[in-house]
Curated annotation (Swiss-Prot):
Gene3D superfamilies (UniProt xref): Survival protein SurE-like phosphatase/nucleotidase (3.40.1210.10)
The keyword Mitochondrion is annotated on this UniProt entry: no
Family: Belongs to the SurE nucleotidase family.
Catalytic activity of the protein: a ribonucleoside 5'-phosphate + H2O = a ribonucleoside + phosphate
Protein name, as recorded: 5'-nucleotidase SurE
Broad class of the protein's primary localization: cytoplasm
GO cellular component, one term: cytoplasm
Subcellular location as annotated: Cytoplasm
Cofactor(s) for this UniProt protein: a divalent metal cation
InterPro entries, sorted: SurE, SurE-like_Pase/nucleotidase, SurE-like_sf
Binding site for a divalent metal cation: D10, D11, S43, N99
Record GO terms (molecular function): 5'-nucleotidase activity; metal ion binding; nucleotide binding
Length: 264
């Protein structure tokens, strides 16, 4: 049976990572792939939606001359419009990526790549998010085409996808992170989220009128515990596969109830 796949990202519709993933998946599977992605770079936007401005959908041509839909909004907007306006149905899968830069640890809540995947799961689709580690900072937020070769990563994502395709989906979102030097022979490790991916840093600068302005930055954390996504990708150089859920309820709900319910 032909699968219906909605392909999105947060790096913009002309990203090489999105195109590589589209081409590799279309070669392997019997699938209708619809690309709906932001017109512009949307990294760090999380699961934000546009409430105070109208959205536009523009048909466009990707680098391989196939058709895509550019949305003047966030990755989550792309999923919403993809489901309700472009496809007019919930696809079998929402796949988000390939992101330029890893999405690890609890900071995934800031990721537009993960935001789109969670929105897909919220609509009832099976969802995957996939990201490639990038150690060259100036490439991480590049808009449009990039000199990075995404084909190895696309094949790795395809191989991981194949493991789940015939099974009941085990979670809401599968988060795949690929080390920058990975090949199809790189080990795949099932992981949990690390506490932190970056140590936050704020850089203050002064503008020509002597007023302060700020850049938010961070330093990569390497010393997370074994078994986490950060340790798998950055220390062991393994592909990380992390099952995620939309339900943010604390794991210790019963303990919380027992301790606090009588206080209300």
């Amino acid at each position: 049976m032909t699968m219906e796949i909605l392909l999105v990202n947060d790096d913009g519709i002309y990203s090489n990572g999105l195109l590589a993933l589209k081409n590799v998946i279309s070669e392997e599977f019997d699938a209708n792939i619809t690309v709906v992605a932001p017109t512009n770079q949307q990294s760090g936007i999380g699961r934000a939606i546009s409430l105070f401005e109208p959205l536009r959908i523009t048909k466009t041509k990707l680098a391989d001359c196939s058709e895509g839909y550019a949305v003047s909004g966030t990755p989550t907007d792309c999923v919403v419009l993809g489901v309700h306006q472009v496809l007019k149905k919930v696809p079998d899968y929402v796949i988000s990526g390939i992101n330029i830069g890893e999405n690890l640890g609890t900071e995934i809540t800031t990721s537009g790549t993960l935001g789109a995947a969670f929105e897909g799961a919220h609509h009832g689709a099976k969802a995957l998010a996939c990201s490639l580690q990038v150690t060259t900072d100036h490439l991480k937020f590049k808009e449009g085409e990039s000199p990075i070769d995404f084909m190895n990563t696309a094949r790795i994502v395809r191989n991981v996808f194949k493991k789940f395709i015939d099974d009941e989906f085990p979670c809401d979102v599968i988060n795949i992170n690929v080390p920058d030097n990975a090949t199809e022979n790189t080990p795949v490790e099932i992981t949990k989220l690390a506490k932190k991916m970056y140590s936050m840093h704020v850089e203050e600068r002064i503008d020509p009128r002597s007023r302060s302005y700020y850049w938010l930055d961070g330093y990569p954390i390497m010393d997370e515990e074994d078994g986490t996504d950060v340790y798998a990708v950055r220390n062991k150089r393994n592909v990380s596969v992390t099952p995620l859920t939309l339900d943010n309820t604390a794991k210790n709900l019963d303990e919380f109830k027992e301790k606090y319910a009588k206080k209300f």
